[in-house]
Amino acid sequence: MKIAGILQELLGNTFMSIAEEMGAVLVKSAYSTNIKERKDCSCALFDAAGNTIAQAEHIPMHLGSMLGLIGEIKRHFKLEEIKPGDMFIANDPYNGGGTHLPDIAVASPVFYDGEIVAFVANIAHHNDVGGRVPGSNAADSDSIYAEGIRIPTVKIFREGELDKDILNLILLNCRVRHIRLGDLNAQFACNKKGVQRMEDVCAKYGQETVAPGM
């Protein structure tokens, strides 16, 4: 189905505004100066196939990392295993994570009428994820195992319920636990806002209009 150029432009700007709003939620909710002041973070929207729809004006290099996470989700989880309210987390550069271990990525599916219509994702640089030195940036490390905890692509939320065991496992391996928790909660809130906004767009225009607009 083709849509009119004006509607295409309207939807494109709507998607960009959603990504920017996600970024505002993340920056304003975060605990660490790395995210609040340096804005070492990014937010993006993807269609159901994992193609990029929009990325907020943060750090373009992060886009590849978020694309990797969406790809890992689609590779390692069957369609019927992904539910509304699920949220995925990863930081391992070799398994769908960021550009390095301190970059933690979080992605959520967007459902409408029982089907996945999009994904929202964000990535943020955490001050510390363990490893042999504070800050988790030992440039002379000869192994990734010295850099910090490796998080494969796993569900951190299952149908809207936080998996506290996985969260505690991550926090136990990080210095300054309360700041890590605050930043992770900001990332979770960011995605929830993105999912809500995308659902609103689908409800307003209908999925038969929104899908071609992506």
Give residue spans per PLM region.
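A short, hydrophobic, proline-anchored segment that marks a local hinge/packing element in signaling
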Residues: 103-113, 121
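N-terminal leader/propeptide and maturation segments of large enzyme subunits in energy/redox metabolism
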Residues: 2-10, 150-214
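A short, polar/charged loop-to-alpha-helix boundary motif
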Residues: 60-73, 127-136
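Regulatory sensory and allosteric helical modules in signal-transduction proteins
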Residues: 48-55, 67-92
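Gly/Pro-rich active-site capping loops and adjacent beta-alpha segments
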Residues: 116-173
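Short hydrophobic alpha-helical segments used for membrane anchoring or interfacial signaling
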Residues: 43-47
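Short, basic/aromatic recognition patches
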Residues: 14-38, 74-78, 92-98
